[in-house]
Amino acid sequence: MALERTFSIVKPDAVERNLIGEIYHRIEKAGLRIVAAKMVHLTEEQASGFYAEHEGKPFFPALKEFMTSGPIMVQVLEGEDAIARYRELMGKTNPEEAACGTIRADYALSMRHNSVHGSDSPESAAREIEFFFPESEICPR
């Protein structure tokens, strides 16, 4: 197993429902360490930059609208096989298909309002972390 970092977002729907602490508890209980975190309210420009790979897709405008609708929590997680472990903890994108006990099965309202985001590869983790956090803001534990 390899020590790695992944990127996570607690999305506006979960922040609005005061689920940050519950989600952080699950992250830490799963053996992942939060090594950087902050609350931000994305501008349309920031959302466009972060989700640039989806520009031109039919869901892009709605995605930007949702992700700019309220504050989000962004965090860097660190641990053994952090990417795979966090993706398992999140559950499938569609909460109806997510395994019982996963974040999305328990908290997601819909496929769009699915409470959390997590990087899907080492490359996307590096890009997403760099988008929000300079290395000086990450505190290995």
Curated annotation (Swiss-Prot):
One of its GO terms (molecular function) is nucleoside diphosphate kinase activity. It is an enzyme of class 2 (transferase). Homotetramer. ATP binds at K11, F59, R87, T93, R104, N114. The active site is at H117. PROSITE patterns: NDPK, NDPK_LIKE. Major role in the synthesis of nucleoside triphosphates other than ATP. The ATP gamma phosphate is transferred to the NDP beta phosphate via a ping-pong mechanism, using a phosphorylated active-site intermediate. It is found in: Cytoplasm. This is Nucleoside diphosphate kinase. The keyword Ion transport does not apply. Belongs to the NDK family. One of its GO terms (cellular component) is cytoplasm. HAMAP family: NDP_kinase. The gene is ndk. InterPro entries: NDK-like_dom, NDK-like_dom_sf, Nucleoside_diP_kinase, Nucleoside_diP_kinase_AS. It catalyses: a 2'-deoxyribonucleoside 5'-diphosphate + ATP = a 2'-deoxyribonucleoside 5'-triphosphate + ADP; a ribonucleoside 5'-diphosphate + ATP = a ribonucleoside 5'-triphosphate + ADP. Its EC number is 2.7.4.6. Its main location: cytoplasm. PANTHER family: NUCLEOSIDE DIPHOSPHATE KINASE, NUCLEOSIDE DIPHOSPHATE KINASE DDB_G0292928-RELATED. NCBIfam families: PRK00668.1. Its cofactor is Mg(2+). It comes from Vibrio campbellii (strain ATCC BAA-1116). It comes from the Bacteria. GO terms for biological process: CTP biosynthetic process; GTP biosynthetic process; UTP biosynthetic process. Keywords: ATP-binding, Cytoplasm, Kinase, Magnesium, Metal-binding, Nucleotide metabolism, Nucleotide-binding, Phosphoprotein, Transferase.
